[in-house]
Amino acid sequence: MDWIDPLTTETRLPLIEICVEGIDGLLAAQAAGADRVELCASLVEGGITPSLGTVRAALDQATVPFHVMVRPRGGDFLYSETEYRSMLADVAALRDLGVPGVVFGCLNADGTIDEKRMGELTEAAGPLNVTCHRAFDMTRDPAEALEALIRCKVGRVLTSGQRDSAIEGLPLLADLVRQAGDRIIILGCGGLDLANIAEVRRKTGLAEMHFAALKDVPSTMRYRNPKVGMGGSDLDREYRNTLTDTPLVAATIAAAKA
């Protein structure tokens, strides 16, 4: 499939990207009217790299562009050399598979953008769309971090304005939109929902917005071994599946574009 950047079509702004976990999430988001999808695994960790099988399923079944998370683990964004090499390999493999875009972010220990690694990863991506994820929100100087990403030729940055929610981050989001101009796209995120997405759009001028409308659904497992868990102490978590809520996605998109 030849992927078209939605901003070059008749898409009604703001463009809406839905963050999903796995192929079922992608299918739910596109059915709800998403303009684009961010494809991840393990959203409980903030999103990590999905499996090869998931990516191939997305290539087979997606009808909207999707950008693939490249993040080898949860936690911070200061990666070892071996972790970084795995990211380079993932980006190259995703480029060769023909995905529309990739999402990654690397920081230095002092809270600045790791321009060397970000530049190399962006170069490895070749023609793919490149987004810096919310590693940006962990930088010490957002204005300088934005300029660093522009120098690295990154196409967009995902940010909540360095706060837990876009509502709290409104002033910085508006400043970043002004600073960015037409040099880089600011992709706003952070607790966006049916009640606040129109306000955030109006007060910031964001052309692109990102959210994950999720719901927990009980597992259909009938037998449950109460004596063992697969990690962590919350055994109930292992019998809850987090899914993209298609009606909520559709309603929130409608509110954003009203």
Curated annotation (Swiss-Prot):
Principal localisation: cytoplasm
MF-aspect GO terms: copper ion binding
Cited InterPro entries: CutC-like, CutC-like_dom_sf
UniProt entry keywords in alphabetical sequence: Cytoplasm
GO CC entries: cytoplasm
Subcellular location: Cytoplasm
Pfam families, sorted: CutC
Highest rank taxon of the organism: Bacteria
Segment forming the signal sequence: none
Keyword Cytoplasm carried by entry: yes
Stated family: Belongs to the CutC family.
Protein name: PF03932 family protein CutC
Organism: Mesorhizobium japonicum (strain LMG 29417 / CECT 9101 / MAFF 303099)
